Regions:
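Short, extreme N-terminal segment that most often corresponds to the first beta-strand
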Residues: 1-22
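Short, surface-exposed structural microsegments at secondary-structure boundaries
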Residues: 17-19, 23-34
């Protein structure tokens, strides 16, 4: 079956879940996908965004909010007692974070969609899937961002 992972910020009690981004949750599935969890992690860790070309054009407070924090890519087969409170030492971080931390994946996707190119790419993928997404939460996010079958989308402005 394989080991599933999520990115965990132990400082803030927040997580990123690969499936929220449409990626597989195994380490090599999401770590090599350029437009998903790793891109989200990059904007969360960015210090000084918005000061140069190639930065994410967004004022979203999530950008850079993880800079300097303790981050772990936690697997569901991870060691018990590592990175968790002493009273929870029989759990691993993946399990503990799943139950106690806040998954901010969809909020980060919304921040990424402040960039017209990223938003257009996400829309084109959804359109190619017939405006259907296997993940119900991500489907609702797309309907909120793009409208039913893309009714809110306009011609890209980045071209």
């Amino acid at each position: 079956m394989g080991q599933y992972y999520k990115v965990v910020n132990t400082t803030k009690g927040q997580t990123l879940t690969p499936h929220a981004f449409g990626s597989g949750a195994k380490l090599m599935e999401f770590s090599s996908d350029g437009q998903s969890v790793m891109q989200a992690l990059a904007i969360l860790l960015a210090d000084g965004n918005g000061r140069g070309g190639g930065d994410l054009r967004s004022e979203n407070p999530l950008i850079g909010s993880w800079a300097g924090d303790n981050i772990v890519v936690a697997g569901d087969y991870g060691d018990e007692g590592k990175f968790v409170p002493v009273k929870n030492r029989k759990e691993n971080l993946y399990s503990y974070a799943s139950q106690n931390f806040i998954d901010i994946s969809f909020a980060v996707i919304e921040a990424l969609c402040d960039d017209a190119w990223y938003k257009q790419q996400m829309f084109e993928e959804w359109k190619a899937q017939g405006y259907e997404d296997w993940n119900e939460e991500r489907q609702q996010l797309k309907v909120n961002l793009f409208g039913e079958k893309g009714s809110k989308m306009k011609t890209p402005t980045y071209a």
